[in-house]
Amino acid sequence: MASEPRAGPVMPMASLGPGGPAVSRVGLGLAALGRPAYITGGRGRDLPDRDVNALRARTFAVLDAAYAAGVRYVDAARSYGRAEEFLAGWLARPGHPGVVAGSKWGYRYTGEWRLDAGQHEVKEHSLAMFGAQLAESRALLGGRLALYQVHSLTTSTAPTPASRITRAASATVCS
């Protein structure tokens, strides 16, 4: 396990919208760390061991380095495999004040931790998917989840009108 992270100088901060949380202007996305095959395909020399424990340890080390460099915003998504789980484990360790966690819904991870999976995610923007994925994200990240975004919503992929999703999100997130 990585050593206790040292807090370096915090980067300049910015608000995520009016009244939103203050975050570092540079954030860290966990897409390539939360699942064994994504943009890391063909990177066997850089990531020789891709089992769950190895990628969890790698995620913790990267998060420790980012925190020491002043990064205070971390982005995950339900489709990033175990990214939320890894982030939650790292946040549970002492020494990470001021970290803002964000996540996204709209894709379901289907790769089952296999490098050779033909399909790694399925896009779905239904109200049912929103509710299920928000509950999963909250179960993992709890009160540290400060921003929840839709992943790649377009008029052609949204079976539910955006206004209904917006109302559901407002009612769910604000309650």
Task: Pin down the residues of each PLM region.
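Short acidic/His/Gly/Ser-rich catalytic and metal-binding motifs that mark active-site loops
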Residues: 34-40, 109-113, 157-159
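General helical structural elements
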Residues: 60, 108, 168-171
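Glycine/proline-rich, positively charged
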Residues: 44-50, 117-175
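N-terminal binding-site loop/beta-alpha segment at the start of enzyme catalytic domains
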Residues: 1-104
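Acidic-and-aromatic substrate-binding clefts and catalytic sites of carbohydrate-active enzymes
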Residues: 77-85, 109, 154-159
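N-terminal entry module detector
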Residues: 86, 91, 100-132, 136-138
